[in-house]
Amino acid sequence: MKLLFIAAEGAPFAKTGGLGDVIGALPKSLAKNGNEIAVILPYYDVIDQQFGNQVKDLFYFYTNVGWRHQYVGIKEMIRDNVTFYFIDNRDYFFRGHIYGDWDDGERFAYFQLAALEAMEKINFIPDVLHVHDYHTAMIPFLLKEKYHWIQAYQKIRTVFTIHNIEFQGQFGPGMLGDLFGVGLERYEDGTLRWNNCLNWMKAGVLYADRVTTVSPSYANEIQTVAFGKGLDQVMRMESGKLSGIVNGIDTELYNPENDPHVTFPFSINDLSGKAKNKKELQEQLGLPVNENIPLIGIVSRLTDQKGFDILVSELESILQQDLQMVVLGTGYQQYEEAFRWFANCYPEKLSANITFDIGLAQKIYASSDMFLMPSAFEPCGLSQMMAMRYGTLPIVHEIGGLKDTVEPFNPFDKTGTGFGFNHFSGFWMTNTLLFALDIFHNHKEDWQAIQKNAMSADFSWDTASLAYEKLYMDLKLF
C-alpha cells in the first residue's frame, strides 16, 4: 500500500509530545512490512539546525492562502525506508518553537494547503492519507470540498487520529474564505460550527473516512460528556467509524539490555543489574543508599491533567512511609514549588528535579521500583509502558490508555503488570500505593512475578502497526 502521513511534528526532526513519537515510529514500522511510506512535515528551524546538511532541495511552487501568494519549498530526506518531505516557508516555521504563536491558525492552514498541493507535484498519491490532531484536521474536508476536482485525489481514503481531544483548533469562521479559499456554506449549515467557532477537529471527525484515537478506552471516553470536551455528541454520532489503537514504544530504544543511559544492563532473566542501577541513582541524587527502601519514580509534566493536584494533596502523608521518591519534570509553578518545598523538608525521601533530562529520565525508568502515574485523563500514555520494559511497576489511575496497558495485580491468581485505582482521588491513590508497598516488602515472590509479567508485555510498534495496517487495508477495499 501507498501510505502518506501529514502531521505538525515527528521525531527525530521536531517533537513536543506523543504525536511526535507516533510519527517517528509508526511509518518506520509500516515500511518494514513492505508498504511504500511518505511523511510530510513543516520544515522548522530546529530541523534546519540539526538536519539541514542531510535534506535535499527538490523544487518550489506558490500556493494561495486566501489573498496571499505564498512560497512553498519542498525538501526531502529518506530515513529508515521512509521518505520525509518538508514544507519550507521561513516566515511560518522559523519561529524558534513549533506551537504557541498568535497566527497558528494561518500557519497550519498554509501547511495543510501546501501539503495537499504537494502530493501531486511529488507524484505521491496515496491509497490512504493519515492526518493527526487539529493541525491537519481540515485536510479530509479540503479533499472533499476544495480539491475534489483533481481526479488523482478522488480515490484517496482518509484516516484522522485524535491524540488529545482537548486541543481542537477553534477559530473565527472568516478563516474559511480568508485562508482556505472556500465558502461559508458548511459553517452556516452547522457542519463545521461548534460554540460559534470554526472547529477544525470537528471537521476532521465528520469528513475523514475513519477516525482513531490512541487507545480503545479513550475512544469510549471521548463519547461521554466528562471527556468529550464538547464534541461528545459528534463522537457518538460518528462512533461507527471510530476505533482506538494503543500506541507502541520503540522497544529497541527502551531496552534494559543495551540502553546507553543505563550503567548496569539487566534482563527479564537476570535483574541483578537493576539493583545496582538503583544504588547508583540513589547516590547521584543524594538519597540514602538502601536497596530495601522502595524507590518511586515520576517523569512527567507537572499539570492537573497528570494528577498532580491529588498527589500534592497527599504528599505529606505519603512521605511518612518508608520510601523514597524521585520527581523529574516541569509544569505549573504551584507544583514545581510544592515539590521543591517537600524535597527541602524531606531531603532523605524526596529528590525534586524541576527540569527535563533524557538521560536522567532513562535512569529513573530503569532504577525505580515503582512508577507513579495518577493522571486525571490519559489518551494513551507512554511512560507506563517504558517503565514496564525496565521492570518498574506502574501505579496508575485506570483511565484511557493506562487502563488498556496496565493490568492491576490480582493477589488471588497472581496476574497483573502493575497496580491501579478506579476513582480519581488522593485517598484511593494512596491506598493503592500502600498496597504496592506491602507487596514490595512482604511478598517478594509476587513482586518478582509482576516484574516479569511487565517486562514480557508486548508494546512494540511492530504489533501496534498491524492494527493500523488492517484498518488501512479495510479502507482500501471499501
UniProtKB/Swiss-Prot annotation:
Residues annotated as signal peptide: none
Molecular function GO terms recorded: alpha-1,4-glucan glucosyltransferase (ADP-glucose donor) activity; alpha-1,4-glucan glucosyltransferase (UDP-glucose donor) activity
Record's catalysed reaction(s): [(1->4)-alpha-D-glucosyl](n) + ADP-alpha-D-glucose = [(1->4)-alpha-D-glucosyl](n+1) + ADP + H(+)
Assigned EC number: 2.4.1.21
Binding-site residues, ADP-alpha-D-glucose: K15
A GO biological-process term: glycogen biosynthetic process
Enzyme class: transferase
InterPro entries linked: Glyco_trans_1, GS/SS, Starch_synth_cat_dom
Pfam short name (any one): Glycos_transf_1
Domain of life: Bacteria
Record key words, sorted: Glycogen biosynthesis, Glycosyltransferase, Transferase
Pathway: Glycan biosynthesis; glycogen biosynthesis
Function field: Synthesizes alpha-1,4-glucan chains using ADP-glucose.
Protein family per UniProt: Belongs to the glycosyltransferase 1 family. Bacterial/plant glycogen synthase subfamily.
HAMAP family in the cross-refs: Glycogen_synth
Protein name per the record: Glycogen synthase
Organism taxonomic ancestry: Bacteria, Bacillati, Bacillota, Bacilli, Lactobacillales
